[in-house]
Amino acid sequence: MAPSLFTGCSTPAPRTAGSDRLELSFKPYDLKLKHAFNLAKNSRTHTPDVQVQLRYGDYIGYGEASMPPYLGETQESVCRFLEQLDLSQFTDPFRLEEILDYIDSVAPDNRAAKASVDIALHDLLGKIMGQPWYRIWGLSPEKAPATSFTIGIDTEEVVRQKLKEAAPYRILKIKMGLDNDKELVRIIRSETDRPICVDANQGWSSKEYALEMIEWLKEQNCLFVEQPMPKEMVDEQAWLHERASLPLIADEFLQRLPDVRRAYGLYDGINIKLMKSTGMHEAYQMAILARALDMKVMVGCMTETSCAVSAAAQLSPLVDWADLDGNLLIANDLFDGMKIVDGKISLPDRPGIGVVPL
């Protein structure tokens, strides 16, 4: 990565003879979207981001915090949080639990900010060990699933253009939650019969309407529906879960590890995102717990560079479904990392999270 990106925004650590300490640096960065990203509740043309480096001796780990509006974090809040961290107290980066517990204790919430350091620390440790994290976790890269390609709420012309871009992908992810949901699916079905999955982004506030849509979507070769109703509507979600003929996946309802048990009985599966889970460490624990509860597991992302997307991809051999196309939606990526080959995730045989700066 260009050194200039990290000029002037850091928490330098003192160096002592014969001793290496963790050194954190960070810099705001704006992700430019190829198309306006239209969801049920908002629209945007860029996503604020903070890029992070964590140094230990000659090793550098990369991380990032991506902040779509609904997370409630900003570049300013992330930088304020990172400025509070004193990682120079740690001379052994392998004290992972202790370091992450310290980071989590500095302030509540700030999940994306915490994730940025967690990702950088995992990248750093993997590089020191000379292994990618999927191998450290004992996972087989051949088991990585196909990933979906996201098509947001948009005009017919833009939707058809996005379908051309999605040609290599086996599964399409459709953003819904507005009055023209069925028309969007009809446009897609006029072009392709590939399986779809639907993310309603909490857009259906009527349980009866949600059930009607789910039954209609089943006829449209839909695999599952994410977050059909507002996360606060727990009783209505329970009603819907009892009646729906498609799997229902928790997204906004789910943030961190304790939420997995809360989702059990209300949803059939969970969508894990590093920016919500505070990073790779807790995301892995969430996936293991969901498996133990016989729930489906999905790994997703925000609009992110290949840094965070490749970090999330390390989990992909452990999941049923993946939605890891956030790096493909931006025009100014900073890294080379995981690839999509014939619609399937291909994990690089590089240490850490598998990325190199462009």
Across the structure, where does each feature detected by a protein language model lie?
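Hydrophobic faces of well-ordered beta-strands that scaffold small-molecule active sites
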Residues: 61-63, 145-151, 170-174, 196-200, ...
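Metal- or metallocofactor-binding catalytic centers and their adjacent structured scaffolds
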Residues: 19-26, 42, 54-56, 60-128
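Metal-dependent enolase-superfamily TIM-barrel catalytic cores that perform enediolate-based chemistry
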Residues: 133-244
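N-terminal export signals
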Residues: 1-14
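Short Pro/Gly-enriched beta-strand edge/turn motifs at strand-loop
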Residues: 30-38, 219
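Flexible C-terminal active-site loop/helix
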Residues: 20, 24-33, 49, 57, ...
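Conserved, mostly hydrophobic/aromatic
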Residues: 52, 58, 117, 130, ...
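Catalytic alpha/beta core domains of metabolic enzymes, predominantly
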Residues: 232-324
